[in-house]
Amino acid sequence: MKQLEELLSTSFDIQFNDLTLLETAFTHTSYANEHRLLNVSHNERLEFLGDAVLQLIISEYLFAKYPKKTEGDMSKLRSMIVREESLAGFSRFCSFDAYIKLGKGEEKSGGRRRDTILGDLFEAFLGALLLDKGIDAVRRFLKQVMIPQVEKGNFERVKDYKTCLQEFLQTKGDVAIDYQVISEKGPAHAKQFEVSIVVNGAVLSKGLGKSKKLAEQDAAKNALAQLSEV
């Protein structure tokens, strides 16, 4: 934790008052499950809070930055900015991936490189920062880390995987694409959806996500990867 504190201080001028919050933000459920007797807290609740404040601040930014964009345009752009892959990238940019506490099994299976875990970590950190320093501190951090990428227009040029898949398949002729929920597991605050993509009656791929939309995106991403190998 000492090295993480030094990183936050030197790179982002952030000094946490409540180090328990910071430690919780960097504790994955797999680590907490392996240390139940120690009553270790994990970062899912902070992730929930961080997701909400991230959506708010990015919405504020887009509203002020693009006065001529419609609600639909801003929603699409916000989705691109806060998508899982983007947040995982920001975790890596901040070197957060080096400090997350994972269970032994998760560590061995490559969890430290997994976008889902790193995206959740970034949101959990924002939640901890909100509770410790307030929303203005979160705004300053995002202005330093995320907004410069948005200013460069990197996200405006990104299409979502569902759109890319639809455009690719349509080049092959008329196709019927259907996204079907296979399963829905877990408590309300930590849902896990599995979705399949059915094209002309045949299953093309499957995907997982914390919401139906994220699972659909994951399935479309997997489908594009499969089709690129054909």
Curated annotation (Swiss-Prot):
Binding positions for Mg(2+) per the UniProt entry: 47, 120, 123
GO CC annotations, alphabetized: cytoplasm
Keyword Ion transport part of the UniProt annotation: no
Active site: 51, 123
Domain RNase III, residue spans: 1-134
The enzyme's E.C. designation: 3.1.26.3
SUPFAM superfamilies: dsRNA-binding domain-like, RNase III domain-like
Localization per Swiss-Prot or TrEMBL: Cytoplasm
Annotated keywords: Antiviral defense, Cytoplasm, Endonuclease, Hydrolase, Magnesium, Metal-binding, mRNA processing, Nuclease, RNA-binding, rRNA processing, rRNA-binding, tRNA processing
Gene3D superfamilies (UniProt xref): 3.30.160.20, Ribonuclease III domain
Pfam family of the protein (one): Ribonucleas_3_3
PROSITE patterns (UniProt xref): DS_RBD, RNASE_3_1, RNASE_3_2
Reactions accelerated catalytically: Endonucleolytic cleavage to 5'-phosphomonoester
Recorded phenotype for the gene knockout or disruption: Loss of correct coprocessing of pre-crRNA and tracrRNA. Loss of immunity against a plasmid with homology to CRISPR spacer sequences.
GO biological process: defense response to virus; mRNA processing; regulation of gene expression; rRNA processing; tRNA processing
Any one GO MF annotation of this record: ribonuclease III activity
Stretches assigned to the DRBM domain: 160-229
Cofactor requirements of the protein: Mg(2+)
NCBIfam families per record: RNaseIII (TIGR02191)
Subunit structure as annotated in this protein's UniProt entry: Homodimer.
Classification via PANTHER family: RIBONUCLEASE 3 (PTHR11207:SF0), RIBONUCLEASE III (PTHR11207)
Function field: Digests double-stranded RNA. Involved in the processing of primary rRNA transcript to yield the immediate precursors to the large and small rRNAs (23S and 16S). Also processes some mRNAs, and tRNAs when they are encoded in the rRNA operon.
Family: Belongs to the ribonuclease III family.
Name assigned to this protein: Ribonuclease 3
Protein species of origin: Streptococcus pyogenes serotype M1
Highest classification ranks of the organism: Bacteria, Bacillati, Bacillota, Bacilli, Lactobacillales
